[in-house]
Amino acid sequence: MNYEINGVTIRSENAAKPHTMPSNYLCGYIKESIKNGRALDFGCGKLRYSEQLVDKFDAVTFLDSRKQLERVQIIRGVKATIPEYIASHYENADVVSFEDMNQITNNYDFILCANVLSAIPCKSTIDQVICGIRKLLKSDGEAMIVNQYKCSYFKRYEIGVKHLYGYIYQNSHNSSYYGLLDEGVVKKICIENNLSIIGSWSKAGSSYVVVGKGKHI
């Protein structure tokens, strides 16, 4: 999606990482999850975790902005749009745009939202994502929200302009935003949007927050 922030255009779709750069820890978490059935990859990007999800769950929905879904790019070594790639590689999988999220009639046992909030420079859109997660979860479903908040790579952002949870960085070609969302920040956002915290922890510079719709201690 494109965001206009103080006269600067930020294209969040450019933040998506390829399947060659997964978190091995998150891959293992998905594989060992006690959840099964139906899953949603909320902010699927370049299908970084698609193989892990389709191997684990009976049906998977991949969701991202219409701009991300419709552009031709290299997806797992294939030049295609995301819907084209999914149609030719995965059974029992479908694709929905963020803009059409309200048309989804299913609810999900598991929702993955990995490195999505950190790419959004707009609080109202972040709230829209979290509200969408709550709406699409089953009553006993769980969502895993992951954000990287510490890395030497981020040092360059700190010379940029402070904005929301992070910084806007400009070079000669484009502008980008990265939010540094630790456990506390993510939990606060989720609680503000009526999600319950099931668990949270940090590992190797990333925050992991598991949320649900029910009451949890």
Region roles according to the model:
Residues N102-I104, R134-K135:
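Short, charge-rich binding segments
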Residues S118-C122:
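A short His-aromatic
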Residues D127-S139:
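A short glycine-rich, Lys/Arg-flanked "PGG" loop and its adjoining helix->strand segment in the class I
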Residues M1-Q103, E142-I217:
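Class I (Rossmann-like) S-adenosyl-L-methionine-dependent methyltransferase catalytic domain
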Residues N36, Y108-D109:
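Local beta-strand N-terminus motif with an aromatic residue
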Residues F57, D109-F110, I133:
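Residue-level detection of beta-strand scaffold positions
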Residues L112-N115:
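A conserved beta-strand element that flanks and buttresses the S-adenosyl-L-methionine
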